[in-house]
Design a protein with these regions (language model features):
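Conserved nucleotide-binding/hydrolysis micro-motifs of P-loop NTPases
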Residues: 4-6, 51-56, 102-105
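A glycine- and Lys/Arg-enriched "phosphate-lid" helix/loop adjacent to the NTP-binding pocket
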Residues: 9-84
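NTP-dependent small-molecule kinase module
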Residues: 57-70, 74-127
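Short beta-strand segments at enzyme active-site cores
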Residues: 1, 46-50, 96-97
Length: 127
């Protein structure tokens, strides 16, 4: 699931930059986010699944959701760039970045197991 941080740092700024959110609406959204951020604790561990555009496109096609079929490569690229910029400055808590270009956690239990092991190590430590 997405966090409130992604909406505020990636999706809303992207919509604003594309001219799909007015300055007033964007300002209101930022104010609401700042209020929410003071009331909600950050996650114990933020897991970022890093993927290239070809991987993202493949996953979208594999899911087969009608509403995702109209997503353009340009839009995906913009979001991916914003994700990379945001994640490089994330300081709210623990962060685990997993490159999923060469993983298949749906069909390969060993890939899923390695991801779970990495999550456990981040949350509970190595021992």
């Amino acid at each position: 699931d997405r966090t409130i941080y992604e909406d505020a740092n990636i999706f809303a700024p992207n919509l604003h930059a594309m001219g799909l959110m007015t300055n007033r609406d964007f300002s209101n959204y930022e104010s609401l986010f700042e209020l929410m951020e003071r009331l909600v604790s950050p996650p114990d561990l933020l897991i970022y699944l890093r993927a290239s555009i070809p991987t993202l496109v493949g996953q979208i096609h594999q899911r087969g959701r009608d509403f995702e079929n109209t997503i353009s490569i340009d839009y995906l690229s913009r979001l991916n760039e914003r994700y990379e910029a945001w994640i490089s400055t994330y300081t709210k808590g623990k962060l685990l970045i997993i490159d999923i270009d060469n993983l298949n956690i749906v069909d390969k239990p060993e890939d899923l197991g390695s991801v779970i092991d990495r999550i456990d190590a981040q949350i509970h430590g190595l021992f």
